[in-house]
Amino acid sequence: MLRTFMHAKLHKARVTEANLHYVGSITIDEDLLDAVGILENEKVQVTNNQNGARIETYAIKGARGSGVICLNGAAARHFQIGDEVIIMAYAQLTNEEIATHVPKVAVLDQENSIKQMLSQEIAHTIL
């Protein structure tokens, strides 16, 4: 049996662009993708801490070191520049893989630079 677990998370990212006329997806600084192990075209879930919007899309690489977090296409209607978002990717794991699974979580600052890397989330933690 496979179970679905979070394997990567960009926490407290800030939207830098919203491009309604792009075909779709979310553009993410390639350094941030690498830090948490999200691959280009991988399915991601994006939640908006300002308005509660929650979408699923796929990641595309943005310029390294740019800090870009750009919602493209229809998603741009639910995310505004400056909104704080959480970007998560999931993996389907076997029971054997679950025993050793360690998600990668990057907590970002206001400029989308990595402030802290976490290997676990502790209940009731406020960052």
Swiss-Prot record:
Post-translational modification: Is synthesized initially as an inactive proenzyme, which is activated by self-cleavage at a specific serine bond to produce a beta-subunit with a hydroxyl group at its C-terminus and an alpha-subunit with a pyruvoyl group at its N-terminus.
Residues recorded as bearing Pyruvic acid (Ser) in the entry: S25
Annotated catalytic residues: S25, Y58
Matching Gene3D superfamilies: 2.40.40.20
Record's catalysed reaction(s): L-aspartate + H(+) = beta-alanine + CO2
Keywords assigned by UniProt, alphabetized: Autocatalytic cleavage, Cytoplasm, Decarboxylase, Lyase, Pantothenate biosynthesis, Pyruvate, Schiff base, Zymogen
Record EC number: 4.1.1.11
One term under GO cellular component: cytosol
Job of this protein: Catalyzes the pyruvoyl-dependent decarboxylation of aspartate to produce beta-alanine.
Cross-referenced HAMAP family: PanD (MF_00446)
Domain of life: Bacteria
Binding locations of substrate: T57, G73, A74, A75
Organism: Exiguobacterium sibiricum (strain DSM 17290 / CCUG 55495 / CIP 109462 / JCM 13490 / 255-15)
Subunit field text: Heterooctamer of four alpha and four beta subunits.
Any one GO BP annotation for this protein: pantothenate biosynthetic process
Cofactor(s) for this UniProt protein: pyruvate
Protein name: Aspartate 1-decarboxylase
UniProt similarity note: Belongs to the PanD family.
Manner of cofactor binding, per the entry note: Binds 1 pyruvoyl group covalently per subunit.
Subcellular location: Cytoplasm
Pathway: Cofactor biosynthesis; (R)-pantothenate biosynthesis; beta-alanine from L-aspartate: step 1/1
GO molecular function, one term: aspartate 1-decarboxylase activity
